């Protein structure tokens, strides 16, 4: 099931991952995420990485 929330971009171009999303995917402070922008569809995708294997 998809979880959607609307977030606002802050002054420093930061966004906060909403609590519902953090809880559902067990995202914690210090976790790594990969941000991808798909120009063809105007979609930004955030992927949670395994910090032990996906760091680089």
From Swiss-Prot:
Instruction: Enumerate the UniProt keywords alphabetically.
Output: DNA-binding
Per the UniProt record, one Pfam family is MazE_antitoxin
Gene Ontology molecular function: any one: DNA binding
PROSITE patterns, per the entry: SPOVT_ABRB (PS51740)
Keyword presence, Transmembrane: no
Segments forming domain SpoVT-AbrB: 4-51
In terms of SUPFAM superfamilies, this protein maps to: AbrB/MazE/MraZ-like (SSF89447)
* DNA-binding found in the keyword field: yes
Query: What PANTHER family is this protein classified in?
Result: REPRESSOR-LIKE PROTEIN SSO7C3
Q: What is this protein called?
A: Repressor-like protein SSo7c4
């Amino acid at each position: 099931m998809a979880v959607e929330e609307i977030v606002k971009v802050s002054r420093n171009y930061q966004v906060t991952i909403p609590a519902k999303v953090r809880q559902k995917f067990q995202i914690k402070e210090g976790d790594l995420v990969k941000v991808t922008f798909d120009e063809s569809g105007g979609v930004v995708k955030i992927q949670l990485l395994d910090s032990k294997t996906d760091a680089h």
